[in-house]
Amino acid sequence: MYAIVKTGGKQYKVSEGDVLFVEKLEANAGDVVTLNEVLACSKDGELKLGSPVVEGASVQAKVVEQGKAKKVIVFKYKAKKDYRRKQGHRQSYTKIVVEKINA
């Protein structure tokens, strides 16, 4: 059984027990979050497609940790003009474990 869920503007194919790194969710470590935007779900070989979401379907996941990804360096310059800008960015993420798919 699997489901396609949308969170943080991205889509993920999940099964029970999967570990995901998603865009930051407002929850603490140990909390259970419910992802209601289920775009499709498959159970016993039968695929349900939503338009845009599957009615009554949800995915429950447990928050393992909140964190930040590795730093990405953004460097802008203009040749021969002595113009240089260096900036770093660390994206926040939430690590979750899928516990249950309700279809």
From Swiss-Prot:
<dbReference type="GO" id="GO:0019843">
    <property type="term" value="F:rRNA binding"/>
</dbReference>
<dbReference type="GO" id="GO:0003735">
    <property type="term" value="F:structural constituent of ribosome"/>
</dbReference>
<dbReference type="GO" id="GO:0006412">
    <property type="term" value="P:translation"/>
</dbReference>
<comment type="function">
    <text>This protein binds to 23S rRNA in the presence of protein L20.</text>
</comment>
<dbReference type="InterPro" id="IPR001787">
    <property type="entry name" value="Ribosomal_bL21"/>
</dbReference>
<dbReference type="InterPro" id="IPR018258">
    <property type="entry name" value="Ribosomal_bL21_CS"/>
</dbReference>
<keyword id="KW-0689">Ribosomal protein</keyword>
<dbReference type="GO" id="GO:0005840">
    <property type="term" value="C:ribosome"/>
</dbReference>
<comment type="similarity">
    <text>Belongs to the bacterial ribosomal protein bL21 family.</text>
</comment>
<dbReference type="InterPro" id="IPR028909">
    <property type="entry name" value="bL21-like"/>
</dbReference>
<comment type="subunit">
    <text>Part of the 50S ribosomal subunit. Contacts protein L20.</text>
</comment>
<keyword id="KW-0687">Ribonucleoprotein</keyword>
<dbReference type="GO" id="GO:0005737">
    <property type="term" value="C:cytoplasm"/>
</dbReference>
<protein>
    <recommendedName>
        <fullName>Large ribosomal subunit protein bL21</fullName>
    </recommendedName>
</protein>
<keyword id="KW-0694">RNA-binding</keyword>
<dbReference type="GO" id="GO:1990904">
    <property type="term" value="C:ribonucleoprotein complex"/>
</dbReference>
<dbReference type="InterPro" id="IPR036164">
    <property type="entry name" value="bL21-like_sf"/>
</dbReference>
<dbReference type="Pfam" id="PF00829">
    <property type="entry name" value="Ribosomal_L21p"/>
</dbReference>
<keyword id="KW-0699">rRNA-binding</keyword>
